[in-house]
Amino acid sequence: MRVLVGGGTGFIGTALTQLLKARGHEVTLISRKPGPDRITWDDLTTSGLPRCDAAVNLAGENILNPLRRWNAAFQKEVLSSRLETTQTLARAIAKAPQPPQAWVLVTGVAYYQPSLTAEYDEDSPGGDFDFFSNLVTKWEAAARLPGDSTRQVVVRSGVVLGRGGGAIGHMLLPFRLGLGGPIGSGHQFFPWIHIRDLAGILAHALETSHVQGILNGVAPASSTTNAEFARALGTALGRPAFIPLPSAVVQAVFGRERAVMLLEGQKVVPRRTLAAGYRYSFPELGAALKEVIA
């Protein structure tokens, strides 16, 4: 299968590319700069979709970059990096004389409203209560294609855990020093997924002809709270993990609106993902963290 991957040079894209190639697929990346097995976004706009069997979009500016202030300019970047790349790919697919069989987009569980009690599956409502939920709604709308000639899948990802990137990269140093702990109250849910499983869900969606619609890209152990995650990471490292990061500090660093992504959370279950036949490599947090820090 020939797969076109937008945003394929990032953390998730690298893992997906490695997995697809290991399964015998050909991968072409869409990036800002040309290179071997790559095209640019400008190429896609001017020359149209290269012949491919499937397309994936992973492109998007890192929302939780602590070096960027949460102001109007950065919010515009966050929006445009997702919506414009998705619209560009969707338009190219719609215009292609031989459209791909599958079109997969990765968004986020920010679609679902934070709650200490609610449980969300793929059919749960959301997408209309704050900047981030509205972003997911617009993002997914930008990917929709007319007709049904191409199978369409959206994977709403949780916090991605893996070596060399993702959420763990920012956490390891304080936890290794014994200075880690829960964020804020620690009571908020922490929907997570191992990078190998997120790549696996994407590959499963590409390869399996009956998979379509929304899939939640989270581990089945979805009742994990932030405090439980902190304890599990401390245990995996053999270090204490009881020093909380105060809410006021998080809000000062990220801004009040963006801090919600860390201080509040959702209990999300992958009901349709499991029903679609995907088998998790890391369904439990302990084993996932052990692999990440090994």
UniProtKB/Swiss-Prot annotation:
NADP(+) binds at residues 31-32, 58-59, 77, 82, 160. Coiled coil: none annotated. Its EC number is 1.1.1.-. It comes from the Eukaryota. The keyword Oxidoreductase applies. It is an enzyme of class 1 (oxidoreductase). Belongs to the NAD(P)-dependent epimerase/dehydratase family. SDR39U1 subfamily. PANTHER family: EPIMERASE FAMILY PROTEIN SDR39U1, SUGAR NUCLEOTIDE EPIMERASE RELATED. This is Epimerase family protein SDR39U1. It comes from Bos taurus.
